[in-house]
Amino acid sequence: MGRKLLAEFFGTFWLVFGGCGSAVFAAAFPELGIGFTGVALAFGLTVLTMAYAVGGISGGHFNPAVSVGLTVAGRFPASSLVPYVIAQVAGAIVAAAALYVIATGKAGIDLGGFASNGYGEHSPGGYSLVSALLIEIILTAFFLIVILGSTHGRVPAGFAPIAIGLALTLIHLISIPVTNTSVNPARSTGQALFVGGWALQQLWLFWLAPIVGGAAGAVIWKLFGEKD
């Protein structure tokens, strides 16, 4: 179990450091900023690369909502759920701390929202709580459907990380303007701890919606996808 938890810790660290790091450092860099598209690709690439790197050790969840969904789908033991979630959240917090230390090393830096997730006045596009709740549930559900489908025994081995990474990229392309894209409670928690205030007050949604969506995606998959 120790190796699995370390794999989840480092995998989630890489997801937050690479994905949120691209948003903090490179998204709006003067003249050469990577924008929403670059950030979306960064998140997708972090999952793709770490799924290949450590997925064989832990399963490559890197996300409490994924762990919940896999548990509901019967692909993951419930007894391992809490340790996995703790490892994922710890990895996200350490990554956010590293990003904070690096970012504050620049004189006059304005951290803004520090890649936190939000709704209402803290949504990049000013979207409401209901909009944020729905999009996070729907996108996390489809993320789980992609994960469960691409890792099914009837699918050729070795291609799942590509499908999963591309799915996460698409998810970000859709929802960055709405919530800054969570679909991952650990990712949201790490950034919110360093923003404080409103980010912590709104954090509940980015636990509730992805977990509901993850469980819903697993149920939907079980209704039709597990049938041969």
Curated annotation (Swiss-Prot):
A Pfam family annotated for this UniProt entry: MIP
Tagged with keyword Mitochondrion: no
Annotated transmembrane regions: 9-29, 34-54, 82-102, 129-149, 158-178, 204-224
Top-level taxonomy: Bacteria, Pseudomonadati, Pseudomonadota, Alphaproteobacteria, Hyphomicrobiales
Localization annotation: Cell inner membrane
Its job: Channel that permits osmotically driven movement of water in both directions. It is involved in the osmoregulation and in the maintenance of cell turgor during volume expansion in rapidly growing cells. It mediates rapid entry or exit of water in response to abrupt changes in osmolarity.
UniProt key word Transmembrane helix: yes
UniProt-recorded name of the protein: Aquaporin Z 2
Complexes and interactors: Homotetramer.
UniProt GO MF annotations: water channel activity
